[in-house]
């Protein structure tokens, strides 16, 4: 499998490069970075103390011409450019970017009619198993329990709530037969009035170097149930992304997520 990494100089990009180098079935063939990155021209393994022979570049077409699959954990505007290049070169995509607009998501979905794409806000195996637990819990706590989702991330995260928190909200809302768009409450301030019992609340914390903590709270009278997932390292995201690459290698065009990759549907 010939793999390229987008955002190669970032925290997640470095973790992905290491995961590819440690996979005997994978070959690192490209490392993309921003056009204004000070690391352009450096070896992709520099941050790991290794030589890979692959230089960081901003030349999309040069990288996509060599790759079978691109792994992309960047930002929406970058990912949209990568989708266009992937369509030109018939390259598959594993996308962990979050913060897309509805229009961008529609473009991503349209692209999946021509190339294989795994798109998931969180590729950790633990998070995706947690989603199944939430579906089960929501069905049994559908009456008399208030549902709140609390997430915490590092100070550099630019979108809120996190994509993972929204995935959890979608899982709970779907299990209850609701649309998250109709019942989500994003933060509270001032005099809000009594809580709507059908709502799903979100609260976001940003600070320090928190990799990612997510708790879904089912608060009833006399008891509360908390289902929590905590990430202590980005390694789990990188390992999940590699599983997604392996999954796509045997598939054609289509839009998939980690539930498909892990056989949880």
UniProtKB/Swiss-Prot annotation:
Binding site for NAD(+): 7-12, 33, 96-98, 120-123
Catalytic activity as recorded in UniProt: (S)-2,3,4,5-tetrahydrodipicolinate + NAD(+) + H2O = (2S,4S)-4-hydroxy-2,3,4,5-tetrahydrodipicolinate + NADH + H(+); (S)-2,3,4,5-tetrahydrodipicolinate + NADP(+) + H2O = (2S,4S)-4-hydroxy-2,3,4,5-tetrahydrodipicolinate + NADPH + H(+)
GO BP terms: diaminopimelate biosynthetic process; lysine biosynthetic process via diaminopimelate
Lineage top rank: taxon: Bacteria
GO molecular function: 4-hydroxy-tetrahydrodipicolinate reductase; NAD binding; NADP binding; oxidoreductase activity, acting on CH or CH2 groups, NAD or NADP as acceptor
Catalytic class of the enzyme: oxidoreductase
PROSITE patterns, per database record: DAPB
Gene Ontology cellular-component annotations: cytosol
CDD domains: DHDPR_N
InterPro entries the UniProt entry points to: DapB_C (IPR022663), DapB_N (IPR000846), DapB_N_CS (IPR022664), DHDPR_bac (IPR023940), NAD(P)-bd_dom_sf (IPR036291)
Entry keyword annotation includes Zinc: no
Pathway where it operates: Amino-acid biosynthesis; L-lysine biosynthesis via DAP pathway; (S)-tetrahydrodipicolinate from L-aspartate: step 4/4
Residues of the active site: 153, 157
Binding of (S)-2,3,4,5-tetrahydrodipicolinate, residues: 154, 163-164
Subcellular location: Cytoplasm
EC number(s) from the headed UniProt entry: 1.17.1.8
UniProt keyword list: Amino-acid biosynthesis, Cytoplasm, Diaminopimelate biosynthesis, Lysine biosynthesis, NAD, NADP, Oxidoreductase
Stated role: Catalyzes the conversion of 4-hydroxy-tetrahydrodipicolinate (HTPA) to tetrahydrodipicolinate.
NCBIfam families, alphabetized: dapB
HAMAP family: DapB (MF_00102)
Family: Belongs to the DapB family.
Name of the molecule in the record: 4-hydroxy-tetrahydrodipicolinate reductase
